[in-house]
Structures are given as C-alpha cells and as structure tokens.
Amino acid sequence: LDMGHMVNAIEQVDEFLDLGANAIEFDVDFDDDGVAKYTHHGIPCDCGRLCTKYAVLTEYLDYVRQVTTPGDPKFRKELVLLALDLKLQRISSEKAYAAGVDVATKLLDHYWMRGWNGGRAYILLNIPLVEDYEFIRAFKDTLRKEGHEQYNAKVGINFTGNEDLDEIREVLEKLGEDEHIWQADGITSCFPRGTERLKKALEKRDTPGYKYISKVYAWTLVRSSIMRRSLRLGVDGVMSNYPDRVVKVLKEKEFSDKFRLATYADNPWEKFTPI
C-alpha cells in the first residue's frame, strides 16, 4: 500500500491519488462528547505540511464514497483503502465507546449507505492508544445492532501509538479480535526513527500461527532512502507525504520484481506469502 498521509481536505483526495497513492489516511477529530465532527489534524503536524486543512466528516465520507463506487463519475479504481486516524487521545477514554458508536453510524449512513450502493474501499481504524480499545467494541456492537455485520469483512484494526506489541496483543485478545489486524510503526516525518520495533512487528507477522498482526506499515516516510530501508525489511505498506516518491522507488530494479502496488483484487487482511 502506498498510503497518502493527512489527506484531510476533499480536494486533496484526488491530488494524492494523482500522485500514485492507492490508500489515503485522514484525521477524525471529535468533540468532547465523542462526536466525530471534522477531518482535521491541527497544529503541530508533519514537517512541510499545512496542518489546518479540514472538511466536515460526513461531507468527506460522502465524497470518498463516490470515489470508491464503481459507475460513479468520480470513481477512481486505484483507491482501495481508507485509514481513519481517530484522534481519540484528545478526548477522555470514557468517551471512546460513544466515539465508536458515532463513527460506525456515520460510515453506515454516509459511506456504506446501509447497503444501497455504498463505497467499496476497505476501512482501517487507526487507534492511537490501547486504552481506547472500547472504541472497537462500540464500533462492532453498532454494526451488529444496526443489522450490518457484513461490513466487518471490510474493517481492520491498527494501534498506532508505538506501544508494546505484547500489550497490544493482550488487548486484542480481550476484545476477541484475531483477524484483520495491521500494525503501524513510525513517527512524524520531522524526526528520524530506528527500525527495532518495526523489525519486531515484522517478525511477529511472519511467525507461523501468529494471528495478531497480518500486515505492517511504516510511517511517515518522506526520504526515498528510508522508503528503501522499509521495503528491504519487507513492510506491507508505507505512509508518505509524497506517494509519487514511493511509486518511483517501487519501480527501481531492486524492488520491481518483489513489490507492486496493491489493487482492489488483493486482500488487505491476508498475510502476504512471497512467491
């Protein structure tokens, strides 16, 4: 996956897809009651980026639905995954359940259209800290209560706070979640980051029978050299401010026969087995 980072304004969606992204990440900002209002990051944010771009979340979901609905004039076949960077760390953990209900409901109403020609992209729920795990419970409860559990097939989970991998596994066990799990590792592009935890995550992913990591991505990469480093380690995805650089690196001789950009025919929840 070549994931565009911080794609918060509606006009940025096509901008990032034009640069070669096949997935986009956007920030979901909540009010104090856990109601998801805007796609907005705010200050401070990644180096060299404007932090203040935003959209009303429901309008954003309406737009990306069109972009991911075959037959729609706005349809772009390359967009296969939407990563929701849920800014739960800005609200109290007690509101994580309410937030999960709200996000699930908004996806049902504005993205999936409750089964009436909704968008087809996979959804990755990026949760900053394990303490906010109630969000996942609420999200799944809501799909069940609303009679739309079929969308679980499209939804994955990812804890993004670089916490201890075994702690993350314990929380997933507690939730009864052992599939559709991504593991991100990274830091804002302003700072360098070593590969120790990334390697551990990849090791777990590649352990036969280990269910709690099926895919790993590194974020937020801007330098081609760091993209190469991550690809050599065998990541499943890269989140970048410059998706066109990722495309370029993937075309290099060293990588072109090992990697390709994922398409909708690929399953984002299955462990990748090299040929």
Swiss-Prot record:
Mg(2+) binds at E25, D27, D85. Dermonecrotic toxins cleave the phosphodiester linkage between the phosphate and headgroup of certain phospholipids (sphingolipid and lysolipid substrates), forming an alcohol (often choline) and a cyclic phosphate. This toxin acts on sphingomyelin (SM). It may also act on ceramide phosphoethanolamine (CPE), lysophosphatidylcholine (LPC) and lysophosphatidylethanolamine (LPE), but not on lysophosphatidylserine (LPS), and lysophosphatidylglycerol (LPG). It acts by transphosphatidylation, releasing exclusively cyclic phosphate products as second products. Belongs to the arthropod phospholipase D family. Class II subfamily. This is Dermonecrotic toxin SpeSicTox-betaIIA2iii. It comes from the Eukaryota. Its EC number is 4.6.1.-. GO terms for molecular function: lyase activity; metal ion binding; phosphoric diester hydrolase activity; toxin activity. GO terms for cellular component: extracellular region. Its cofactor is Mg(2+). Expressed by the venom gland. Disulfide bonds join C45-C51, C47-C190. The keyword Disulfide bond applies. InterPro entries: PLC-like_Pdiesterase_TIM-brl. It catalyses: an N-(acyl)-sphingosylphosphocholine = an N-(acyl)-sphingosyl-1,3-cyclic phosphate + choline; an N-(acyl)-sphingosylphosphoethanolamine = an N-(acyl)-sphingosyl-1,3-cyclic phosphate + ethanolamine; a 1-acyl-sn-glycero-3-phosphocholine = a 1-acyl-sn-glycero-2,3-cyclic phosphate + choline; a 1-acyl-sn-glycero-3-phosphoethanolamine = a 1-acyl-sn-glycero-2,3-cyclic phosphate + ethanolamine. The keyword Repeat does not apply. One of its GO terms (biological process) is killing of cells of another organism. The active site is at H5, H41. Binds 1 Mg(2+) ion per subunit.
